[in-house]
Amino acid sequence: SSAFLKARPEIRTACYVAITADRGLCGGYNSGILRATEGEVKADVLASKDYLVVPVGRKAENYFRFRSYKTSRSFTGFSDAPKYEDAKAIGQFVVDLYLRGEVDRVELVYTRFVSSGRQEVVRRPLVPLERDVIAGGDGKSASGGNYEFEPDPELILQTLLPRYVEARIYAALLNAAASEHAFRQRAMKSATDNAEELIKNLSRIMNRARQDSITTEIMEIVSGAEALGSDDKDDVVREMASN
């Protein structure tokens, strides 16, 4: 059977592929992935197990390296528009780590896009692959049927399973990119709404200050006019008295 399907008897080193964005200004998108990955790493450390983080995105790269976590090669520069070649490069790298025995399990940590208003951080096993059992009507596994393979089934597995790993990584990258755009759209809308509210408040304050200034000037003019009028009356009275 393929090495992709064989679970290791003991998980000594776990590998986490943390998919974040290359840029910020997207609300809590990056922090959710970083917290989830860091939580798994700390749990491994408490269990006396080793770990390795594969950062995807500059935010993950900067976060884990700045805090001196064990990291491997990082993959950056494509978070907003990933291509299949990007997933292929990541897949080949982590599969090579697994086949060489440097890690015993590989997991994806990314943000799953549910809808434009809902995204969730998920952790999905990548290698070894999990087998799905199709249940029959009697509660037992359904019959697989008789199939003829050309070429040999082992050769087909060895060819298709790495492609399957790449496809799953690509799906995770697409989910992450859609989630990043949704988070950024909400963050920018919130910033715009806050800016408009701030403009209204500042305009109200400015108008009030301008009104107070105009009122003060009018009061000064009226007071000055009244003072001048009072002086003129005094002059007339003195002139009449002298006559």
How would you name each of these model-derived features?
Residues S1-N243:
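C-terminal beta-strand-loop-alpha-helix "lid" module of Rossmann-like NAD(P)-dependent dehydrogenases
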